[in-house]
A protein has these predicted regions:
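A short helix->beta-strand "capping" segment at the edge of beta-propeller domains
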Residues: 14-31, 61-67, 71, 200
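Beta-rich, blade/repeat-based domains predominating
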Residues: 30-41, 74-84, 114-127, 131, ...
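Conserved beta-strand positions in repeat-built beta-propeller and related beta-rich domains
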Residues: 45-50, 88-95, 130-134, 175-179, ...
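Short loop/turn segments that connect beta-strands within beta-propeller blades
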Residues: 59-64, 102-106, 142-145, 187-191, ...
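Blade-loop segments of beta-propeller domains
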Residues: 63-100, 106-118
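Hydrophobic, well-structured mid-protein blocks that either form specific transmembrane helices
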Residues: 98-156
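Loop/turn-rich, solvent-exposed surfaces of beta-rich toroidal or solenoidal domains
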Residues: 158-192
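Blade-level signature of beta-propeller repeat domains, shared across WD40, Kelch, NHL, RCC1
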Residues: 219-246
């Protein structure tokens, strides 16, 4: 009996929340309904959503200035993006259509299709990871955009659903969870939740324009080891440093 109870306890164990500190803040476009967020070669690449307002942007982090932009045509609702091999991939929400752009010119190179909804994207340099609002992450071959496998994300025995914007950071996948201000740290090998980061206090309610203005945007500057976070319609981007677990 003791061993059975011990097994249940271990199986249901929830990883500890990890603390953070704000290093610096940067300006962010208050009209950007952020759905995709990556940092490459000194610039932010941001995908925004809403029909008629969806876009792909190249942004100067320090000034917040949009230096390059492609407006996604209606009726598409832009979602997550990822930058790989001089190309930018962008999902759409319910149209089952994604777009491929040339990284330098933002020229639309082509499109691709997938089943279900498109939410978030990231890559590890070799494979693309995609979220669809469930507890599963799809792993794609970037050359063919065909699915290789799926990963079910679990915190103990509980599946973590509504996985949204993604970022590959130091060998882990960091994921926003829709309608929360929490980030979950995920093992890409087996989907195990390695920890949580609660950012509910990083931006006051007074600075948020409404209930849809939730945390959604994680970007990692690998060259400088900087972790950046923002949210939909947020006025700021925050550089944060994760604190060692106690």
């Amino acid at each position: 009996m003791f061993l059975c109870l011990l097994c249940l306890f271990v199986a249901g164990f929830s990883p500890q929340e990890q603390g953070y500190r704000v290093v610096k803040s940067y300006p962010h476009d208050r009209d950007a309904f952020t759905q995709g967020f990556e940092f490459r070669d000194g610039f932010l690449y941001e995908g925004t959503g809403l029909v008629g307002r969806s876009s792909l942007r190249k942004v100067n982090l320090d000034t917040g200035q949009v230096v390059q932009r492609f407006d996604v045509p209606q009726p598409f609702f832009g979602e997550g993006i990822t930058v790989l091999n001089q190309r930018i991939f962008q999902l759409t929400w319910q149209s089952q259509t994604g777009f491929i752009y040339d990284k330098s010119s933002f020229r639309l190179m082509g499109s691709f299709n997938y089943s279900g909804e498109g939410w978030g994207m990231t890559n590890d340099g070799k494979q693309i990871y995609m979220s669809d609002g469930t507890s599963q992450l799809r792993v794609w071959d970037p050359a063919t955009l065909k699915e290789i496998r799926r990963i079910t994300v679990k915190d103990g025995v509980r599946e973590v659903t509504a996985l949204n914007e993604l970022e590959f950071v130091r060998g882990e996948i960091l994921a926003n969870v829709w309608q929360t201000d929490r980030i979950t740290r995920i093992s890409p090998a087996d989907g195990k939740v390695l920890g949580w980061i609660d950012l509910s206090r990083i931006l006051s309610k007074a600075e948020r324009p409404g209930p849809d203005a939730v945390l959604n945007g994680i970007a990692y500057d690998a060259a400088s080891d900087r972790l950046l976070v923002t949210g939909k319609l947020w006025p700021k981007i925050f550089e944060i440093q994760l604190l060692p677990k106690k």
